[in-house]
């Protein structure tokens, strides 16, 4: 099973449709669960660290002992699509649950990064949150097509 925990919501219909399409495609190979964590209001907190701590508490409630946690972070390791597919294959073939965590506009608290088994960076570039979620789903889908030998990845 794959769980995707996201801070923030998708607002635009076309991003929602893209996410739903990838989740539908993935459903033939794995169960996929998406959890949206409401992004905290910056005006309620004295500083960003307190805001991130509150979001981290909400995220950690959805992560169980024994789950393999992958956090997306600009300072993480960059993987090729084939390496990402190998990671998926190793975990899914053993029946392990993988949890992908996507931070909000303020990033993620250190507590989440410390809980991660792996930090992954897609790029040094900054992406809009909604678009990044689609990129994550696309890479998970691409990974499964590589694993299954389906012509999609070039």
Swiss-Prot record:
Q: Name one Pfam family in it.
A: SPOUT_MTase
What is the top EC class of this enzyme, as a single word?
A: transferase
Tell me where on the tree of life, at the top rank, the source sits.
Bacteria
Keyword Methyltransferase on entry = yes
GO CC annotation: what is one? cytoplasm
Gene Ontology molecular function terms on file: rRNA (pseudouridine-N3-)-methyltransferase activity
Disulfide links within the chain: none
In short, the EC number is 2.1.1.177
Entry's localization field: Cytoplasm
- Cite the entry's keywords alphabetically: Cytoplasm, Methyltransferase, rRNA processing, S-adenosyl-L-methionine, Transferase
Q: Where does S-adenosyl-L-methionine bind?
A: 103, 122-127
Spell out the reaction equation it catalyses. pseudouridine(1915) in 23S rRNA + S-adenosyl-L-methionine = N(3)-methylpseudouridine(1915) in 23S rRNA + S-adenosyl-L-homocysteine + H(+)
Transmembrane segments annotated in the record for this chain: none
What does the protein in this record do? Specifically methylates the pseudouridine at position 1915 (m3Psi1915) in 23S rRNA.
Q: Which NCBIfam families match?
A: PRK00103.1-3, PRK00103.1-4
UniProt family annotation: Belongs to the RNA methyltransferase RlmH family.
Q: Subunit structure, per the record? A: Homodimer.
Protein name stated in the entry: Ribosomal RNA large subunit methyltransferase H
Organism listed in the record: Caldicellulosiruptor saccharolyticus (strain ATCC 43494 / DSM 8903 / Tp8T 6331)
Name of the coding gene: rlmH
């Amino acid at each position: 099973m794959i769980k995707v925990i996201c801070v923030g919501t998708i607002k635009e219909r076309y991003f929602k449709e893209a996410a739903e399409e990838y989740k539908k495609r993935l459903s033939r190979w794995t169960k996929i669960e998406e959890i949206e964590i409401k992004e905290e209001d910056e005006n309620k907190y004295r500083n960003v660290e307190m805001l991130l701590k509150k979001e981290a508490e909400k995220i950690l409630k959805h992560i169980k002992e024994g789950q393999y946690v992958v956090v997306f972070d600009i300072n993480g390791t960059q993987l090729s699509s084939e390496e990402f597919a190998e990671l998926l294959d190793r975990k899914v073939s053993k029946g392990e649950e993988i949890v992908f965590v996507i931070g909000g506009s303020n990033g993620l608290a250190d507590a989440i990064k410390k809980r991660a088994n792996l930090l992954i960076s897609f790029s040094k570039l900054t992406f809009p949150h909604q678009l990044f979620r689609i990129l994550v789903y696309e890479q998970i889908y691409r990974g499964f097509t590589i694993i299954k030998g389906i012509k999609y990845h070039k």
